[in-house]
């Protein structure tokens, strides 16, 4: 007969007293703190601290994110978390001009900011104008519209394509204007499901030498069409960094369907995946895969 006596020493729990953030001259503290999964006053968790560091790094606002956990003076069961960030430029203002024999002078301008006033909100404004092409768009996204991470975004756009000025075979003109709203719902630590609904109006002018596919479109749907595309997507981001990823993956599954009541009946689906594999300290292998499918329904073709 053999008897065993087990003695278990659970050790001492270590708590996080305070989280200190430095280096964020523009970005507000709350933008960084809301990405932390390690809470003040909670038990110290290496897993939660590493996860928090990755989430802050994936924001794309910082060149570097460093985390230290020094012990609190005269305390054996408490530590502080010191996070030091180095901010990077998150906005851009661009102006451009070009020239081609067919389109003549082409002008473009854009303003974008991924971190407006340090709030973490995104805004962009784009304008492009040429002899045959005009595009204008504005976009805004609040990634934390609610405290639990529900995002809200708006988009508006106008696109004009007029090939008559090319003075070549196949003249037509399209004029599209639209606007939409987007909502993102986090369903897991690295997973987000997004829903969107837009309304757009497209006018098509065809002429004597217009391509047959545009003539067929106007014959089937009319010169002016109204469309209400509903979109749904799932995205997963497990990269180690948004700026310079060296490992991890991203996945995106996207679907779009025209809502009944509009002039178009179609659906589209696509899947996009990226892999990152570290080869050396200076080289990373990047593999990209993408495929999609679309068709019409209710007896109509995919436009």
Predicted segments, located by residue:
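Gram-negative/organellar outer-membrane beta-barrel architecture
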Residues: 26, 42-244, 249-250
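Extended, domain-scale alpha-helical bundle/helix-rich regions
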Residues: 4-14, 25
């Amino acid at each position: 007969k053999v008897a065993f006596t087990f003695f278990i020493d659970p050790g001492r729990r270590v708590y996080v007293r305070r989280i200190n953030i430095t280096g964020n001259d523009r970005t507000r503290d709350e933008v960084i703190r809301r990405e932390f999964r390690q809470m003040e006053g909670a038990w110290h968790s290496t897993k939660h601290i590493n996860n928090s560091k990755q989430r802050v790094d994936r924001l794309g606002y910082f060149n570097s994110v460093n985390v230290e956990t020094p012990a609190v003076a005269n305390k054996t069961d408490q530590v502080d978390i010191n996070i030091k960030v180095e901010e990077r430029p998150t906005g851009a203002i661009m102006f451009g001009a070009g020239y081609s024999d067919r389109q003549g002078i082409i002008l473009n301008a854009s303003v974008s900011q991924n971190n407006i006033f340090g709030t973490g909100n995104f805004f962009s404004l784009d304008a492009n104008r040429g002899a045959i092409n005009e595009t204008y768009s504005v976009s805004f996204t609040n990634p934390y519209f609610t405290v639990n991470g529900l995002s809200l975004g708006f988009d508006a756009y106008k696109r004009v394509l007029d090939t008559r000025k090319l003075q070549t075979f196949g003249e037509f003109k399209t004029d599209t204007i639209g606007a939409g709203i987007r909502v993102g719902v986090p369903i897991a630590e690295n997973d987000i499901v997004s829903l969107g609904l837009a309304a757009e109006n497209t006018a098509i002018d065809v002429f004597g030498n217009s391509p047959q596919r545009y003539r067929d479109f106007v014959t089937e749907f009319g010169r002016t069409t109204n469309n209400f595309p509903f979109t749904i997507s799932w995205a997963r981001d497990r990269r180690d960094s948004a700026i310079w990823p060296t490992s991890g993956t991203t996945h995106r599954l996207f679907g779009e369907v025209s809502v009944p009541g509009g002039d178009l009946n179609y659906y589209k689906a696509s899947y996009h995946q990226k892999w990152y594999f570290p080869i050396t300290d200076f080289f990373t292998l990047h593999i990209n895969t993408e495929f999609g499918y679309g068709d019409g329904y209710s007896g109509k073709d995919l436009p």
